[in-house]
Amino acid sequence: SYAALRRGMSGDEDFHAIPRLSLAAAAGPGQFAGGEAPFDNFGFSGRWLRENGFDPKMLSALTVEGDSMEPLLRHGDEILVDRGSRFERDGVHVVRMGDALMVKRLASAGAGRIALLSQNLAYPPVEVSLDEVEVLGRVVWKSGRL
């Protein structure tokens, strides 16, 4: 009920301000990064962050641009990136290739290689050397319009 929801928002719980960065991670061919200055914050429950093992100092929010990760991530979705989680296992990550930031599903592709995979099958996989890409963090949460 609404009353129960309001009781859960009593202010007794700690919240952490997670910076929303003024750059986008492209779900497409790649977006040139502008700067990494926060323009706003998302408030996340400290309890939720602890339950999920997240360090608030290692989290940033970015906006998804493009359609290559649809239907998982849509253009305009906000994503939470755990910068403390590098590529240790397959999953959705934010990567930098040159000046471009991209959000892609990563998979091992043999010794010293990595595959950048789109959810949208209209985009073919891209295989690169680990030296060509910097894994900035793992996508751990998303928010978007219905």
Task: Please tell me what each predicted stretch does.
Residues 68-72, 82-86, 130:
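Short, surface-exposed secondary-structure edge patches
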Residues 108-146:
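Glycine- and charge-enriched low-complexity intrinsically disordered segments
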Residues 1-75, 136, 141-146:
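Short, positionally conserved secondary-structure boundary motifs
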Residues 96-102, 132-134:
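Short coil-to-beta-strand transition motifs
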